[in-house]
Amino acid sequence: MRFTKMQGAGNDYIYLNGFEKLPADLSALSRRMSDRHFGIGADGIVVIMPSDHCDFRMRMFNADGTEAEMCGNASRCIGKYVYDKGLTSKTQLTLETLAGIKHLILDVKNGTVSRVSVDMGNPILSAPKIPVNTSLSEIISYPLEIENNKFNITCVSMGNPHTVIFLNEMERYDLHHIGALIEHHELFPKRTNVEFVEILSPDHLKMRVWERGTGETLACGTGACASLVAAVLNGKANRKAVLHLLGGNLDIEWNEKNDRVYMTGEAVTVFEGEWNNNI
């Protein structure tokens, strides 16, 4: 079975051609392939499939085998994958995800895709739709205590749940420990991704992310979008900013006119290979 390892801002996934026959148990396949000691090593797998009403459809599985709604960085890499491999000649694509239809614009240079912009859609602020177990309609700067640490959280869904926390000095905190506790907190019936954000300026935000089902990763596209939305809601940032992640930078814009969030960043092919292991 052929695979392609790709990364966007350090968010690395294994990409599989779903137009060809694949193993039935994709959850187990993701656990095996994603293992960084006994497999290829990745944040998960992404399967590119035919769609009845879009150019392509994606399914993605985290490293622990759980299926996720979508991933912004992965959607950019899908744009590069399908164009560079000749599955399409279009530079504007529609992508079907469990979080709805996403629109991709490909920046092609010398016959290959270098950067991709994604229309990530409208942010969801309604607490029941994120979802969050609360009687409140929205969670904006909501006080939450985690092991004697008091945080103010803002919850946003970009098709998947995110909890954003603003910190002045990230290095003071054990983000792995705190991230895991918040991910599994009773407030979040479907668990949550957790973003830790430090405001460098209204146009530059530093972010680290604890991803649901994976742990800390170098980047998260939907998390970067949710972080900018949360920063704007809390009066900490402009509607267009650069998000500085461990794996690289993403340009994020929350458009005031149409309420949609746009993400732009690189998409990189790391290597390709053949997977011969049984699941």
Task: Give short role names for the model-derived ranges.
Residues 1-112, 163-279:
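A glycine-rich beta-to-alpha transition motif near the start of alpha/beta enzyme domains, typified by
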Residues 105, 119, 131, 143-145, ...:
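Generic structural detector for well-ordered beta-strands
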Residues 115-117, 121-123:
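Membrane helix-loop-helix hairpins that form the core translocation module of multi-pass transporters
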Residues 1-21, 118, 135-136, 141-156:
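N-terminal, positively charged, Ser/Thr/Ala/Gly-biased leader segments
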Residues 124-128:
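Short, charged/polar, Gly/Pro-enriched secondary-structure boundary elements
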